Regions:
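Interfacial loop at the N-terminal end of multi-pass membrane proteins
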Residues: 15-60, 106-131, 168-169
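Structural signal for membrane-spanning alpha-helices in multi-pass inner-membrane proteins
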Residues: 20, 66-73, 100, 151-158
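A hydrophobic membrane-anchoring alpha-helix module
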Residues: 141-161
Length: 170
């Protein structure tokens, strides 16, 4: 069962890393090119759509699944794999969930008060929002990638431990 948790952990974490990477490299720079009014309007839409059960399952699954994989590895006696999976969960909790809840969500709530009309006001508001939001999204991107790498290493260690034991090696 722990291998199912590893696969789900890798999938959820990779999907989140891809989302954050896309925002860092495509979405935010693209919104900047479209002008402040368009950018504010688009982010209003994105912030509405993101509040979905499917997104929540994947977003929080990237925390829960590594913990379940760590528990499974630990129960199987694969301490190294358990530690790496636990580290992945810790990194994800701090760099992705923590940053999201402490920085990006409050910025999104501020953005919700911006109106689409009034280009001059929107230009100042967008600049005030987009810079910090993008910077902290880079942190989330790097955190998700680092958590993903820890999970890959954890699964490799777990699989290596299984293979070593099947051949009578310690």
């Amino acid at each position: 069962m722990r291998h199912v948790f590893f696969v789900l952990a890798l999938l959820c974490t990779a999907l989140n890393a891809g989302i954050f990477y896309s925002f860092s490299t495509i979405v935010m720079p693209g919104l900047d090119l479209g002008g402040a009014a368009s950018a504010v309007n688009a982010m209003h839409g994105i912030n509405t759509i993101v509040r979905s059960p499917i997104f929540a399952i994947v977003f929080f699954g990237a925390l829960v699944m590594p913990l379940l994989a760590a528990f499974g590895s630990r129960s199987a006696g694969h301490r190294g794999a358990a530690r790496l999976a636990g580290l992945a969960a810790l990194i994800y909790a701090a760099a992705v969930i923590g940053v999201t809840l402490q920085v990006n969500v409050p910025l999104n709530e501020t953005l919700a008060s911006f109106t689409v009309a009034g280009t001059d006001a929107n230009a100042a508001n967008w600049k005030e929002f987009a810079g910090p939001w993008a910077l902290w999204n880079h942190v989330r991107t790097l955190g998700a990638i680092l958590a993903l790498l820890c999970l890959l290493a954890a699964w490799a260690v777990d699989l290596t431990s299984v293979n070593r034991r099947s051949y009578g090696l310690r």
